[in-house]
Amino acid sequence: MTVSENSVLETEVLVGGSAMPNERPGAMEPQSLSQMPEGFPRRSTVANGVRSKVSRRFFVVGGALLLSAFAIYEMGAVFSIGGITPLEYLMLVLFAINFCWIALAFCSGIAGFFMLLKKPKPNELEQTELHTRTAILMPTYNESPDRVFSAVSVMAEALSQTGHGHAFDWFILSDTTDPEIALLEEQAFLVLRQETHKHSRVYYRRRRKNVARKAGNVADFCRRWGSRYDHLLVLDADSLMESSTITGLAQRMQADPDAGLIQTIPSLINGTTLMARLQQFAARIYGPVIGTGLGWWVQKEGNFWGHNAIIRTEAFMGAAGLPNLKGKPPFGGHILSHDFVEAALIRRAGWSVVIAYDLPGSYEECPPSIVDLAVRDRRWCQGNLQHSRILPTKGLHWVSRLHLMTGIMAYLSSPFWLLLILTGLMLALQAHFIRPEYFTDQFSLFPTWPIMDSDRALRLFYITMGVLFGPKIFGVLLLLKDGNFARSVGGRIKAILSVIFEVILSALIAPIMMFIHCGAVMSILMGRDSGWSPQRRDDGSMPWLTLIYRHRWHMLAGVMLGYAAILDSLTLLAWMSPALIGLWLAVPISAWTGSIKIGEFFKRIGILATPEERNPAPICIRAQEARAAYQAHIEQPWTLAQVLKDPALMELHLAMVDKQPLRAAGTPIEPVEAIVHVKVHEAQCQQSALALFNRQEMALVLANPLMLRSLQKLPEQFVPEDLVSFC
């Protein structure tokens, strides 16, 4: 059968036409990190072009440096009264690193606070007609199909009602490796097509081989279909976006010829466990302060968080092709945290990267438990530490390098905080158990007194706590100032109680996460790869024995630190207790925060409520209703045996199989493919063949029309008359 005949057959088999549109191949070459590509940066076509205001940088970055310099000077003064010892020098260095990290967030928070006090500007582009084409991409990897396809259904329907639906095409780009989920995706796609084919163009493709994970998934789309579109709007499997936000992003991109990427700040929704609701509340109350401040000062040198953003296809394909790093994982191979790198490369090429902090209606979900957060952070940690290989890239803007550094510090800060705690503990134990050396080997008429300026130290502690909690304080002030905002979370009293509860619970969880991040960093430095595990998104509960195993080292660390503190004094133990209690109670805290029942209890009493929870947007309500409907549609999943037995089902399945060959002609066959070929060839019947396949082999068979046709020709079951003897 020719390609054109096959396309006609697909159109007849699938409602709404073929599973994917005709390909329009385009180049997306891996970018050089060691030299600036020819023709970069591009020249702007408008006056002033891609320029940012230096005054904003001076206020935030300069302010953070001045604040850090003051704090470091004060810390040095605390130790300098009697001369600084080696341990005190170490503590000073660790304090400097940690304080610089929180000072930048504090100064960004100040900027965000004052920006949020202003009235938002009206959207001048709201009525702009779209004459560009945008592909909305929903990558998925072993996710619940009911969640993914129902979300696309409601977003596509809402977008079609705006009058701009003609400017958008929807793509579900699957990297699913589980054969059962792959078949469920096909069932869900058929339902989606039935619902949307009259008003939207929705497509589906499952890659046969998920090279380079999500970045490779999107790159594969770009190389095969990207040239059909002006923009790419990238979502995640748990994303939702209001139609006004989708059209707003496209209108902004169309209006600014220098825009390479526009990133929204997603709100967290649909949290059911206590941990998820804690993250939702914190992100809603404090997140806008940091996000708005960041967007205000980075200006045209913003960042990309991997989803809920629109990208100019020309900029992405021409400047953001990711190279493989030399060596093996975790520091070599494919770039894991691709988003920061893609933003940096797009900016290097002369395009702007903007954070649209003023654009609401962008949503995502969060991990339901500490364990799920740890699994996600292990992967992110590896990707962010891998950015140490990207930092020397030729031609990067200094703000892009700062984004990479902050990503690295998001995880290295935990080992630095732990070292700071241990150094302080060692200083206390040294003063308690070791006799001071008043006269050193060098001649001096005056002794070296191991003393500190306690008043200055206490003052510096208060300053540090103010800087650390500053963004939270700004968020609370904005909440209390805005009566409508306060009412949307249950009123000012409930809001204050929620803030107090969030601070206490976050303080208990923080030391657990510190040790989790320390373990992740250590694992990466030892050369262990994170792999790619699908995320749990709803229930975070786990058996108690599993939690004891996962948190055993955290509890042991808490006991050891507590023992070391009590060797000095009960006062030191009391000072360290906020961190130690969380470690001692790691298992019950992990169990309770991952519980849906406890999450529902706090929801009933109105603690940790958010506006999106109390008064959800219509798109969120419709998504929940549609998900339940999709669950009902696919509650009886197809099996490969059914596909082989039913010719009509086989044709439906083949119409949704990716047409790209598993491997290029002349390239070596992979072991798993060779094994499947042998099993299919040797099989006496379909039943015996299916019994021989493992999940990986089953997924490969589903994606291979030739193997499926070969299996289809076999009898369904073995009968003695069909016995073939081999001599």
Swiss-Prot record:
InterPro entries: Glucans_biosynth_gluTrFase_H, Glyco_trans_2-like, Glycosyltr_2/OpgH_subfam, Nucleotide-diphossugar_trans. It comes from the Bacteria. Coiled coil: none annotated. GO terms for biological process: glucan biosynthetic process. It holds the Pfam family Glyco_trans_2_3. The keyword Protein biosynthesis does not apply. Residues 18-42 are annotated as: Disordered. The chain crosses the membrane at residues 58-78, 90-110, 278-298, 408-428, 460-480, 496-516, 572-592. Keywords: Cell inner membrane, Cell membrane, Glycosyltransferase, Membrane, Transferase, Transmembrane, Transmembrane helix. Its EC number is 2.4.1.-. One of its GO terms (cellular component) is plasma membrane. It is a multi-pass membrane protein. Pathway: Glycan metabolism; osmoregulated periplasmic glucan (OPG) biosynthesis. One of its GO terms (molecular function) is hexosyltransferase activity. It is found in: Cell inner membrane. Involved in the biosynthesis of osmoregulated periplasmic glucans (OPGs). NCBIfam families: PRK05454.1-3 (NF003956), PRK05454.2-1 (NF003958), PRK05454.2-5 (NF003962). Belongs to the glycosyltransferase 2 family. OpgH subfamily. This is Glucans biosynthesis glucosyltransferase H. It comes from Shewanella sp. (strain MR-4). The lineage of its organism: Bacteria, Pseudomonadati, Pseudomonadota, Gammaproteobacteria, Alteromonadales. The gene is opgH.
